[in-house]
Each structure stands twice: as structure tokens, then as C-alpha cells.
Amino acid sequence: MVGLEKNDPLMLARQLPIKSVALILAGGRGTRLKDLTNKRAKPAVHFGGKFRIIDFALSNCINSGIRRIGVITQYQSHTLVQHIQRGWSFFNEEMNEFVDLLPAQQRMKGENWYRGTADAVTQNLDIIRRYKAEYVVILAGDHIYKQDYSRMLIDHVEKGARCTVACMPVPIQEASAFGVMAVDQDEKIIEFVEKPANPPSMPNDPTRSLASMGIYVFDADYLYELLEEDDNDENSSHDFGKDIIPKITQAGMAYAHPFPLSCVQSDPDSEPYWRDVGTLEAYWKANLDLASVVPELDMYDQHWPIRTYNESLPPAKFVQDRSGSHGMTLNSLVSGGCVISGSVVVQSVLFSRVRVNSFCNIDSAVLLPEVWVGRSCRLRRCVIDRACVIPEGMVIGENAEEDARRFYRSEEGIVLVTREMLRKLGHKQER
């Protein structure tokens, strides 16, 4: 069996995910998304008309054959926990399949909140060891992408690595937000710097840097040993990017895995898709791209479905109002339970149970679930948070000064509207 595994990639693709456990780091606050994450963790933020951001990492695990998953939570975890309990409870424990929720909790040493990404795993080592996995896949729960982790596991084993880091080129002006690495001809990582002020460029491309995606594969025993050493290091910040990966790099045990090798794409000629929707503009832009004629991310790929909690909702409905005006939409995503009455929706994303009343014009907007838009409103280049009631005649996205005074307006001109902001303006939020 061992000999067959070494020579047969198909056998490796089947066996390695079974021998692995995935740990999804889902405790991030996502402060750059402003008020959108005041009451929910970033992985629980809505995306793409019906999903949550964490659904992408979870779906990648399932589609890759990894059915032992731990989700490490911390900040504002209730919404996230509720979503996973409702939408991801189909695993068969008798077949050793599960999604374990691992919240931050008081332990013997007195820690409560996780001190860093590595500490989030360290504090749960007693539970993780019980999984008896040979490989541990560490994932961020707040990125949008499709990846076959079994291909990364194969790469890890074939290179004889103790740690493998997924990477991709990014524009050098954006590289300061990532861990940046240099590799040799065998893709061994020879240098790793976390979020450098002056990121080094790639040898063959001075305009780009080779960035870590925060996706790691470890030999399990090696990871546990590293984490125990790091836990006892008073000078450590207990973070994978700042402490663990540089230490492994110095030991010559870390290898890079180019993301294009495992990125799942319907069109092999397209650019590999991976987004950190950590700012309001990036979030708005990534949502609206899904409504374009040919989106960069294919959500209709039946061979790599993105799963989520599916509510029992009626179909979306477009109706005439009493004046005879038709509800119309163009280049938009409109989810179940929506009703558009005598209004026009263009290049927008409407999540479930959104109601747009008569004489409205919605353009380049993202409306989260249960938003109610009163008559004669104009909404443009905005994100409307869940269950907001937009009063009759309100105009958003046309006057920069007024938008900044009433709501949050980003430097790029994207407006975020929440229930609390509307209440401060004197608008009731109960229908």
C-alpha cells in the first residue's frame, strides 16, 4: 500500500485527505469592513447573494475529500456558530466525519482570548491530537477562492516537506499586507518576511512579490512540536506568519506551493481567483463581479459546488405596481424571497427576502438579507446591511458630502448603511 501511494497520484489524492484534518481560523474581527463586522465575525459576513464567506473554505474541504474539520472561533461568534450548526450538520460521525467548533475559552494557564493565529491552534492542541491526523491543513476562514487541497497535500508529500505554504504573485504595492517569500529552484522557501514595509520583488518580475496566502499544510507531529516550543517562548507573538513560518524557513523545512497548481477553475486560461475581501471596496467589488456577464469566479461549476445553509424560500418575484410600471433587473443576482415591484435593479446583488418597492432605481448596490427599500429611492455604489429599512425617497450614493455625514463613505466612494446609522437619523427600523 505504501509503495502504491508513492507512485500513484490518484491513490494519494484519495488517501491523503482522509489522513488529514483541516483547521479553519475563523475568529477574525475584520475591522477594515467597518460597521459590517460590528455584530458578526468576518467569516460570517454575507457574500454572493446567499453565502457566508466561510462557506468557501468549508466547501473546499468537502470537495477536496477532507471531512474532519475544526473551526476555531473567537470574536462575535454567535452568527457564525448558528450558520455552521444549521448549514453544515450533514456529516456522518459514524464515518469519522465532523465539523468541530473550537471557541476561545478559559484554560489552566489563564489564557482567554487567542494571542495570535498559532496560539489559536495551540490552545486547542488537546482536542486536535485526538483526531490522530497525519497532516494538518491550516486555513483562513475569510477568503474567497476555490482550491483542491488534495493537490496541495500531494505536493507536500512528494517534496518531502514538513511544512508547505500556498503562495501566489501579488502586485508589489500590495505586498506589504502579506507574508512575502523567496524560493529556490526546488520551491524551498529560503526567506520569509511577514508584512514587510519594503517587500522584495520576484527575481523574474520586478512588479510583483511572492505572497503567502495563509494556507498551510503541516506534518501533524512536527506542527505540535513547533507549537509547544512557541508556547513557551516569551518573545513570540504566537503567530504563524510572524513566528512559526520564519522559524521553519530557517530550519530549511518549508516549501512553497504555487496556487495555480491547485486552484479550481472552469476556464484553464483565466487568472487564478483568490480574494481577501477585507475592505469595504474589495467586498463590494467582489460581490458585484459575480453579477457581471462573465464573472472572474464561476459559482455555477457543478463539479466544485459552494455549499451553504439553504432556507425554505419562495422564488424571487418581479411585479407591476399599480401604475403599470414593471419590476426589472439587468446583470444582477436576485435571491429567493425577493420582491421587486415597479423598480429597476442594475448591476446589483440582492440577498434573500429583499423588498424593493415602487419607483426605485438600484444601481451597483449590495443589499444584504431582509433589506426593505421604500418607494422612490435611489441607491448607488453602496452596501446596505441586513434588515435595514430605507425610508421612502432616500437617495444614497449621489452626494459625497451628504453620504459621509449620514453614513460611512470609503475613500473610493462606497457607502455603507446600517440600522444604527439610520436610527441616528431618526428613521424607524421596524416595519
From Swiss-Prot:
AMP binds at R40, H46, R52, R130, E370, R386. Its EC number is 2.7.7.27. The record marks Q74, W113 as: Could play a key role in the communication between the regulatory and the substrate sites. Pathway: Glycan biosynthesis; glycogen biosynthesis. One of its GO terms (molecular function) is ATP binding. Signal peptide: none annotated. It catalyses: alpha-D-glucose 1-phosphate + ATP + H(+) = ADP-alpha-D-glucose + diphosphate. Alpha-D-glucose 1-phosphate binds at Y114, G179, E194, K195, S212. PROSITE patterns: ADP_GLC_PYROPHOSPH_1 (PS00808), ADP_GLC_PYROPHOSPH_2 (PS00809), ADP_GLC_PYROPHOSPH_3 (PS00810). Beta-D-fructose 1,6-bisphosphate binds at K39, R419, E420, M421, L422, R423, Q429, E430, R431. Allosterically activated by fructose-1,6-bisphosphate (F16BP) and inhibited by AMP. Gene3D superfamilies: Hexapeptide repeat proteins, Spore Coat Polysaccharide Biosynthesis Protein SpsA, Chain A. Keywords: Allosteric enzyme, ATP-binding, Carbohydrate metabolism, Glycogen biosynthesis, Glycogen metabolism, Nucleotide-binding, Nucleotidyltransferase, Transferase. Pfam families: Hexapep_GlmU, NTP_transferase. One of its GO terms (biological process) is glycogen biosynthetic process. CDD domains: ADP_Glucose_PP (cd02508), LbH_G1P_AT_C (cd04651). Belongs to the bacterial/plant glucose-1-phosphate adenylyltransferase family. Homotetramer. Involved in the biosynthesis of ADP-glucose, a building block required for the elongation reactions to produce glycogen. Catalyzes the reaction between ATP and alpha-D-glucose 1-phosphate (G1P) to produce pyrophosphate and ADP-Glc. This is Glucose-1-phosphate adenylyltransferase. It comes from Escherichia fergusonii (strain ATCC 35469 / DSM 13698 / CCUG 18766 / IAM 14443 / JCM 21226 / LMG 7866 / NBRC 102419 / NCTC 12128 / CDC 0568-73). The gene is glgC.
